[in-house]
Structures are given as structure tokens and as C-alpha cells.
């Protein structure tokens, strides 16, 4: 039964968009919040579809999201941005369990936890102090590897980040 685009549900529209994108057999796709407007009940099926297609078609995604739970599910590495600049990159579980940059710590602390009795680490970050560092040193900070391919932005302008490459599946 043929339908017009306005007659499709959000999930159907997203599947059509995915099909239109992948019909060209790309090796790399930028996905900017592809599931944010979907109902929670449909979101997981779209993410599973994307992961299965990535594996079957050998395509890599740069998945842009504000939702760290989605990033954890979709990506093997996460790059955190502050004021439009990448401040930390690491394997997903490494970054979520051992954040180093003050903004990453604050971002992780802001994730709501459904169980109020769950005791989690809360990071206290002074955003005025963080903003003053950005103003003082600029926002183009070099990245350094602190081990396990965990990169953080630094204010030491003598460090080069030309060796830094993004992995095949990364969330920003």
C-alpha cells in the first residue's frame, strides 16, 4: 500500500532514511541524533537495526548524541565535546567509568539514575573555572594519551595531537 511521507510513523520515516542512506553503500555515515525524536519503544529497534546493518554492510558511524545511555549502547568509543571542541576520547566503558576532563565528569554526574538508593560518584565541577580556562588558553587544546588510548584535552600548547585518529565507531 503506497503512502506519502507525512503518513509514515517516526520509526517508519527513520527506517526509510536509513535505507536511503545505505543504498549508496557508504563506508562512513554521520548520524546526528537519529533516534532522539523517536518514542522509547521504537528507539531500541532502530538502534539494533543500525548496529546490525553496520556489521552486515561494514559501515562505520559517527553517532552524534546528547544521550550517554544511547552512546553507551551504540558506540565502542566516545568523544566528548565542550564549546564545540573535543575534550576527551576513550573506549566507551573506560570513559564512563574513569572520566578525566572536568566537563566529562560533570556530564556523567548529570545522568539521572532511576534508583535513588544507588550510590554513585558525583563530580563537582566549577563551570566558571572551566570557562575561564577556555578563555585563558583558548579552545583549541592539544590532546594527550593518558593510557589505554584515552585522550584528554590539555592546556599545554607544546603537545601535538596530529597522531590522534578517530576509531570506526565513535559517538560525539
Where are these regions (language model features)?
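A short, surface-exposed alpha-helical micro-motif characterized by mixed small hydrophobic
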Residues: 71-73
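Charged, flexible cofactor/metal-binding loops and thiol motifs
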Residues: 91-159
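A short, proline-enriched helix->beta-strand linker immediately N-terminal to the Walker B motif
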Residues: 23-27
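Hydrophobic anchor residue at the start of the ABC signature
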Residues: 18, 46
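Conserved ABC ATPase signature
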Residues: 4-8, 12
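Conserved small/polar residues in nucleotide/adenosyl-binding loops
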Residues: 162-168
Amino acid at each position: 500500500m503506497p503512502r506519502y511521507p507525512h503518513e509514515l510513523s517516526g520509526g517508519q520515516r527513520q527506517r526509510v532514511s536509513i535505507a536511503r542512506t545505505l543504498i549508496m553503500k557508504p563506508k562512513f555515515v554521520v548520524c546526528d541524533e537519529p533516534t532522539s525524536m523517536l518514542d522509547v519503544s521504537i528507539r531500541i529497534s532502530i538502534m539494533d537495526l543500525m548496529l546490525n546493518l553496520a556489521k552486515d554492510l561494514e559501515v562505520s558511524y559517527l553517532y552524534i548524541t546528547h544521550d550517554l545511555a544511547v552512546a553507551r549502547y551504540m558506540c565502542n568509543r566516545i568523544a566528548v565535546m565542550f564549546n564545540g571542541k573535543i575534550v576527551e576520547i576513550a573506549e566507551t566503558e573506560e570513559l564512563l567509568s574513569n572520566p578525566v576532563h572536568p566537563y566529562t565528569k560533570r556530564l556523567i554526574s548529570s545522568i539521572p539514575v532511576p534508583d535513588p538508593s544507588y550510590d554513585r560518584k558525583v563530580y563537582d565541577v566549577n563551570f566558571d573555572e572551566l570557562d575561564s580556562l577556555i578563555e585563558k588558553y583558548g579552545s583549541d587544546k592539544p590532546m594527550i594519551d593518558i593510557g589505554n588510548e584515552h585522550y584528554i584535552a590539555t592546556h599545554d600548547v607544546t603537545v601535538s595531537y596530529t597522531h590522534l585518529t578517530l576509531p570506526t565507531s565513535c559517538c560525539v
